[in-house]
Amino acid sequence: MTIEQLIWLVPLLPFIGFVINGLGRNTLSKGLVGIIGSGVILASFIISVVIFFSLQGDTQKSHEVFLFDWISAGTLHIPLSFLVDPLSSIMLLIITGIGFLIHLYSTSYMHDDAGFGKFFSYLNLFVFFMLLLVLGSNYIVMFIGWEGVGLCSYLLIGFWYTNSAYASAAKKAFVMNRIGDLGFLLGVFLMFNFFGSVEFSKIFPQAANMLPGNNTLILITILLFIGACGKSAQLPLFTWLPDAMAGPTPVSALIHAATMVTAGIYMIARSSVLFDLAPFTQHIIAIIGAATALVAAIIALTQTDIKKVLAYSTVSQLGYMFLGLGVGAYTGSFFHVLTHAFFKALLFLGAGSVIHAMHHEQDMRHMGGLRKKLPVTFLTMMIGTIAIAGLPPFSGFFSKDEILAHAFQYSPVLWGIGVITAFLTAFYMFRMMFLTFLGKYRGTHHEESHVHESPAAMTTPLIILAVLAAIGGAINIPHVFGGNEWLAHWLAGAGVAQHELDLSHSTEYALMGTSVVAAIIALLYAYTRYVKGSRVPVADEAPRSALAKLSYNKFYLDEIYDFIITKPLDAFSRFFYRVVDTKFIDGIVNGLGWSTNEASKGIRLLQSGNVGFYIFMMVFGIVALLLYTFLYI
């Protein structure tokens, strides 16, 4: 079968799984729900692999598959069509491959949950919309997938909606994403007005003939970037992502590794032709990316919830990716999307294994000494930690250092922020590992006796992801190490902008050495502090230094937003309700009712209830009409 015949099955199968599990959530057995939910994603992955290898052997690297003409009004023509090229083919493998491992993991992790069928139907729908997002051949189809993953994140973050805090976290994610989505939508409208189309195949060739610095292009790219900030959790719109930990742990893994948060990176990489012509926008992206990476890393330093540490690490790593996009390292950023998907899915699922073993305890202050109890979880998570810390030869080393090298070429200041962030990343990640797995168990002996390794359905995905986190960097080994940068050549076939490094090998080695040394120093400091020194984070109410307090309270960003946005809007809405709605609008409506009522009281006096009087008036009226007829007509 050809690519054109196969591609529509990739998103269709998860949608079928959503329908079957959604309709049969209360009637199908949990075993059957798990088989259907995981099976459709596995089938999509297998088809994606076939498409990927077919594309490799094809001289034509881009296939636009038309399904049907969806909207046609005047000059606006929007077909429902898919674009299969090197960029989307890699995303298909990430979404379906890691998505399948998360589904498999969930069959065990969520087995005792009453909403098992509903959970799998939501997961399938999430994957469907993400596939629609990356396959769309125009910005409208992409936007449908974009909004769909936002809806599914709301459903999954608030899956345990009976807990009011979890329900609030879901609403927060939904609302903050809508802010970014408005920017994306305005950017699409402006694009249609400027280019006369929303199709990639028509916009990008026109843009390629334009000179850099066009004001309209700058405005379009800024609006698109605002959309990416919301979906991919960048300053100032990142505070929803840590709260998304309210959902079940497999949801966290899916959102943070394989789907939602990578959408903004993908959209900018897909639109790299436009962003390359807007250097002002790129500069903003680089600054915000670097700032987000640093701020989130500082916040992660003092968190005690194992999932919150990983959540802020995701925000920080996304900041790295945006830094790369801003300095023109589109391939490096996408490379980091790929490696991050491996080690972040591994770390979240590993954290889920710990939480499962600890009977839903997430506070690292109550853990410790779990290495012997959870050997597979410990070993696999350690591989993921080494990868995210950027130590060679694990995957994160290659992708992170490619971004840092481009950052150095663009601005040594941004590179310096990146290196500081690398140091902090290694410190808080090894801090998490040491507090969780080394030292002595900080709970009771009775609790410790019930800690055990997770079942095979949960550990198998960990092992697979650990292998990928260890060797995944091989996909784009740089020339300085004798590699051929396969990924860069592959993405060039999708029109992703390429910017070569203009650095000597000695400079590249020095830059890599600096970041590696920073990570090793951070590792040793964390070991000295939390293993040799047996330090445990202080209780929530204990006094902290000013910087630690700032970090622990997340720079008070939620409180600031509450003060400058939420409270004024709340006060305005109360004023509007009490004055405009209650007194003015209700006054008009109620005043009309009162006037009608008072007028009816006077008219009511004519209704005496005397039948004789009614007959008299009827006769009088008839006589009057007859006289009028004879006299005047």
What does each model-identified segment do?
Residues 344, 423-432, 518-538:
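Hydrophobic alpha-helical membrane-embedded segments
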Residues 101-145, 151-450, 454-457, 468, ...:
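Hydrophobic transmembrane alpha-helices and their helix-loop junctions in integral membrane proteins
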Residues 75, 83, 478-514, 528-633:
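Aromatic-capped, Gly/Pro-kinked transmembrane alpha-helices
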Residues 11-26, 100, 229:
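N-terminal signal-anchor/start-transfer transmembrane helix
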Residues 1-6, 23-121, 194-214, 218, ...:
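Transmembrane helix-loop-helix hairpins at membrane boundaries of multipass inner-membrane proteins
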Residues 77-95, 214-228, 417-421, 499-522:
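Hydrophobic alpha-helical transmembrane segments
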Residues 39-56, 180-190, 384-388, 461-480, ...:
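Hydrophobic alpha-helical membrane-insertion segments
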Residues 61-76, 201-210, 399-406, 479-505:
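Membrane-interfacial helical/loop segments at transmembrane boundaries in membrane proteins
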